[in-house]
């Protein structure tokens, strides 16, 4: 397995946020994480990426701590976090500047990342000159430049309009098609989850536990066809029912506290 979450629990002060969360991400697999608000999804992603140490349990990337530079992973957030004074090309190159790559090798990696995200013709543009969707593409290209084993994505499309979100979902499908890179994808949008993921991990209300793991029985290419729409909608409804049950139970607990 590329990525392992092994009995992860976490608390902030006296507040339990995650409780005994375990799952795996195989090489080239995409796992979506969904659940009610406040269930610890972003906290879990920070632990998987080595930004936060769990109170209990462990995360491993190819048998080593996730912040081990030999097994790179990288984040794509809702906030693009681009350097406004740098061009698109310079933003994509930024994470490579202090690596062992020489200038020619860095340029080759940047060129490839720009090509894969459709940004080759925008390399000289500045972030303020780009739409929200294009800025998010720059963020994705920057993530791809480090050649990650795992891409960690936290609501990467939530700030975008529906048309741009659809275009970027198609981009993600294309980028993940060769199976060389896995991903963990946090989203509130269940359509995104069933379109992009191989499996969906449903977390319970806080403290987040694994309520259920739902497998998507189609390839991502098959999900784009008209015949798949009914099956995908059924899966969305299944996920929504699970999350709704957790949200209702959480509200009852508050009322009886």
PLM feature spans:
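Helix-to-loop junction immediately C-terminal to a conserved catalytic motif
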Residues: 49
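Short coil-to-helix segment of the ABC ATPase nucleotide-binding domain corresponding to the Q-loop/switch region
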Residues: 86-94
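The feature captures the beta-strand-to-loop junction immediately N-terminal to the Walker
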Residues: 34-36
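Conserved ABC ATPase "signature" region
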Residues: 97, 104-122, 174
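Conserved ABC transporter NBD signature motif
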Residues: 57-68
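A short, proline-enriched helix->beta-strand linker immediately N-terminal to the Walker B motif
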Residues: 145-149
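Conserved ABC ATPase signature
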Residues: 126-130, 134
């Amino acid at each position: 397995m590329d990525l392992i979450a092994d009995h992860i629990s976490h608390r902030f002060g006296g507040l339990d946020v995650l409780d005994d969360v375990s799952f795996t991400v195989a090489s080239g697999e995409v796992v979506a994480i969904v659940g009610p608000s406040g269930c610890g999804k972003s906290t879990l992603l920070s632990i998987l990426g080595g930004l936060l140490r769990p109170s209990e349990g462990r995360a491993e990337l190819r048998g080593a701590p996730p912040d081990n530079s030999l097994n790179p992973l990288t984040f794509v957030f809702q906030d693009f976090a681009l350097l406004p004074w740098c061009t698109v090309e310079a933003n994509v190159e930024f994470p490579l500047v202090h690596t062992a790559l020489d200038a020619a090798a860095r340029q080759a990696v940047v060129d490839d990342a720009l090509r894969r995200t459709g940004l080759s013709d925008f390399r000289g543009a500045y972030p303020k000159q780009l739409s929200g969707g294009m800025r998010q593409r720059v963020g994705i290209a920057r993530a791809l430049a480090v050649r990650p084993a795992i891409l960690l994505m936290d609501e990467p499309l939530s700030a975008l309009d529906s048309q741009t979100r659809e275009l970027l979902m198609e981009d993600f499908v294309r980028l993940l098609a060769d199976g060389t890179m896995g991903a963990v994808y946090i989203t509130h949008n269940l359509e995104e989850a069933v379109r992009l993921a191989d499996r969906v991990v449903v977390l319970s209300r806080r403290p987040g536990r694994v309520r259920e793991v739902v497998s998507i029985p189609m390839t991502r290419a098959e999900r784009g066809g008209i015949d798949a729409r009914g099956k995908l909608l059924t899966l969305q409804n299944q996920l929504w029912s699970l999350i709704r049950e957790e949200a209702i139970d959480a509200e009852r607990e508050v009322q009886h506290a």
